[in-house]
UniProtKB/Swiss-Prot annotation:
Heme a3 binds at H376. There is a cross-link at H240-Y244 (1'-histidyl-3'-tyrosine (His-Tyr)). Mg(2+) binds at H368, D369. O2 binds at Y244. It is a multi-pass membrane protein. It is found in: Mitochondrion inner membrane. Belongs to the heme-copper respiratory oxidase family. Residues 1-11, 87-94, 171-182, 262-269, 328-335, 401-406, 479-514 are mitochondrial matrix. The chain crosses the membrane at residues 12-40, 51-86, 95-117, 141-170, 183-212, 228-261, 270-286, 299-327, 336-357, 371-400, 407-433, 447-478. Pathway: Energy metabolism; oxidative phosphorylation. This is Cytochrome c oxidase subunit 1. Keywords: Calcium, Copper, Electron transport, Heme, Iron, Magnesium, Membrane, Metal-binding, Mitochondrion, Mitochondrion inner membrane, Respiratory chain, Sodium, Translocase, Transmembrane, Transmembrane helix, Transport.
Length: 514
């Protein structure tokens, strides 16, 4: 029975739960790695050893957080749980493929961990640029294992994307048009399209790197007529859409949370929200070289990528102001989920502003590979994606489990986390503007103060993570049943009770849309 339910599962709710548990577990590993980084940087001088081990930790931290925490939780966890419920489908379109998508992730994670255990580990950074990732600078199997890990995670995501696209387009009730699906469903659909289009390019790039390392090809080796810049183009053509893949489902969740706790029956500017997400998805594919301003591009090329990157601020602004307009005039309920959503809007906007700074190629040439960039993307990820995940978790936890979290603890948790992440990442803007470079385990004494502050902040965040584990235990131990859910007609995922039955629909849904 246990094997049938959890190993061979074809139920979207169980697979969603598996994704959430796996993501939480990987998140702990990723957090541990980040604390090692901040412990090393807490003061000048060496703590862990040389720069190789430090860079192995940095690389693993990035891969674990992106591929094994944010993506499994947002797309696999919330996506699997909520999309079928929100469109009235009995399950996903391909339930067994859904199971395979999940079970490709633990072996992938295992390969990534193995890569750090053999030889010297993969100290390449998550970008895995040759020639550093080549077989001279990284002899041994480490980088090869990392590449295989990425292949598995990529196949998992591509299969999941096919599944979501098919489900969302094909399994709605006949009366429901695409423009009547909730915004979270839209966000997952657009994310899935981005995955489907970008991951094969990454697969091509890392496969060429694999053959360069092992089969004597020279795709990225000038000695044989290759070009390492080609790898950068292939990687970032995936890498930039990837960062939008990480944030788009969060946009969808924030729209639902803000609408719900403002007491509104729909978000402000539904169509604008949809078109904004589609625009962001499209533009995400034509700005990749802004990660490469320092490789020596023409001034015309730089001008194009600068302008195109800034254009993304427009649909993003549409979303931010629509969330604020949804709040306007509402009967606002200051629940923990609402606090996460408001924190998301504020901090994501701050991260977006530093992004506009970095979009200027002239400025980026100075700021590239400094802590300013680290501060920028951690504001949009560590306070964008993670805040969206936390908001979604405390909002939908009663739906998933049937129990309620303690409100006071949840608010305390938010406060500690808010202080922690800001104390960690705000000082990094100062470090970057002062020229402290990324990916080094040691630094001149002049940078000590802000690094110490940053490292203290990371330990405050650790306290918040531990408090969250306690909160979840407390909820399951206290067994407070869900009393009543408001607004069920506009939030149909709640319609079937908390938690919903194992099989939501025994027969196809019939929807009458006025």
């Amino acid at each position: 029975m246990f094997m049938d339910r959890w190993l061979f599962s074809t139920n979207h709710k169980d697979i969603g739960t598996l994704y959430l548990l796996f993501g939480a577990w990987a998140g702990m590993a990723g957090t541990a790695l980040s604390l090692l980084i901040r412990a090393e940087l807490g003061q000048p001088g060496a703590l862990l050893g040389d720069d190789q081990i430090y860079n192995v930790i940095v690389t693993a931290h990035a891969f674990v957080m992106i591929f094994f925490m944010v993506m499994p939780i947002m797309i696999g966890g919330f996506g699997n749980w909520l999309v079928p419920l929100m469109i009235g489908a009995p399950d996903m379109a391909f339930p067994r493929m859904n199971n395979m998508s999940f079970w490709l992730l633990p072996p992938s994670f295992l390969l990534l961990l193995a890569s750090s255990m053999v030889e010297a580990g993969a100290g390449t950074g998550w970008t895995v640029y040759p020639p550093l990732a080549g077989n001279l600078a990284h002899a041994g199997a480490s980088v090869d294992l990392t590449i295989f890990s990425l292949h598995l995670a990529g196949v998992s995501s591509i299969l999941g994307a096919i599944n979501f696209i098919t489900t969302i387009i094909n399994m709605k009730p006949p009366a429901m048009s695409q423009y009547q699906t909730p915004l979270f469903v839209w966000s997952v659909l657009i994310t899935a399209v981005l995955l489907l289009l970008s991951l094969p390019v990454l697969a091509a790039g890392i496969t060429m790197l694999l053959t360069d390392r092992n089969l004597n090809t020279t795709f990225f080796d000038p000695a044989g007529g290759g070009d390492p810049i080609l790898y950068q183009h292939l990687f970032w053509f995936f890498g930039h859409p990837e960062v939008y893949i990480l944030i788009l489902p969060g946009f969808g969740m924030i729209s639902h949370i803000v609408t719900y706790y403002s007491g509104k029956k729909e978000p402000f500017g539904y169509m604008g929200m949809v078109w904004a997400m589609m625009s962001i998805g499209f533009l995400g594919f034509i700005v990749w070289a802004h990660h490469m301003f320092t490789v020596g591009m023409d001034v015309d090329t730089r001008a194009y990528f600068t302008s195109a990157t800034m254009i993304i601020a427009i649909p993003t602004g549409v979303k931010v102001f629509s969330w604020l307009a949804t709040l306007h005039g509402g009967n606002i309920k200051w629940s923990p989920a609402m606090l996460w959503a408001l924190g998301f809007i504020f901090l994501f906007t701050v991260g977006g502003l530093t992004g506009i700074v970095l979009a200027n190629s002239s400025l980026d040439i100075v700021l590239h590979d400094t802590y300013y960039v680290v501060a920028h993307f951690h504001y949009v990820l560590s306070m964008g994606a993670v805040f969206a995940i936390m908001g979604g978790f405390v909002h939908w936890f009663p739906l998933f489990s049937g129990y309620t979290l303690d409100n006071t603890w949840a608010k305390i948790h938010f406060t500690i986390m808010f202080v922690g992440v800001n104390m960690t990442f705000f000082p990094q803007h100062f470090l970057g503007l002062s020229g402290m470079p990324r990916r080094y385990s040691d630094y001149p004494d002049a940078y000590t103060t802000w690094n110490t502050v940053s490292s203290m902040g990371s330990f405050i965040s650790l306290t918040a993570v531990m408090l969250m584990v306690f909160m979840i235990w407390e909820a399951f131990a206290s067994k407070r049943e869900v009393a009543a859910v408001e607004l069920t007609t506009t939030n149909i995922e709640w319609l079937h009770g908390c938690p919903p039955p194992y099989h939501t629909f025994e027969e196809p849904t019939y929807v009458v849309l006025k």
